[in-house]
Amino acid sequence: MKNIILLIILISLSSCSGYKPILTSKDINFNILDIKVNENDRISNNIKKKLKIYSDQEQKENTISLEINSVKQVYAIAKDSKGDDSVYEMKVITNIEIINLDTDNNKVKFEEKFSFNNQSNKFELEQYKKDIQNDLIDKIVEKLILNLRTTK
């Protein structure tokens, strides 16, 4: 019985040997020349910071510039019996214009949202909102990178 379980584990582990991560920087076929954001837009500035590693690439076949505009919305979607807000939803909408030097410009829109419960401690609630915002920004950056890798 132990030999059969060991054999199953070995077979399953050996079948996973072809794993290759999607977001490796080795297979990047684009170079970000310039990223324009509004100075007052914190979300766009965070996205710009996360994309900096793609602007330091050696000369690639596809050189692009980006214009990023982002909006964050937080609104109540449910109330408790007293009429106080109990559930919130945070939505981050990012409009990105991809300016390709070789081809036409392309506009893409990414929208991510997350629902969360209200907390009695307002400081913890604000920290939680910041964490959620960073997670949503990470998802948007991930989608943008996949979009840029597939666009030629």
Regions found by a protein language model. Name each.
Residues 1-10:
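Sec-dependent signal peptide recognition
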Residues 12-15:
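C-terminal motif of bacterial Sec signal peptides marking the signal peptidase cleavage site
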Residues 17-20:
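Bacterial signal peptide processing site
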Residues 23:
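Cys/His-rich zinc-coordinating "finger/knuckle" motifs
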Residues 26-43:
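Post-signal peptide N-terminal segment of mature Sec-exported envelope proteins
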Residues 39-53:
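Short extracytoplasmic
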Residues 49-54, 58-63, 67-134, 138, ...:
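Surface-exposed short loop/turn segments
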Residues 147-152:
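Amphipathic, coiled-coil-like alpha-helical scaffolding segments used for oligomerization/assembly
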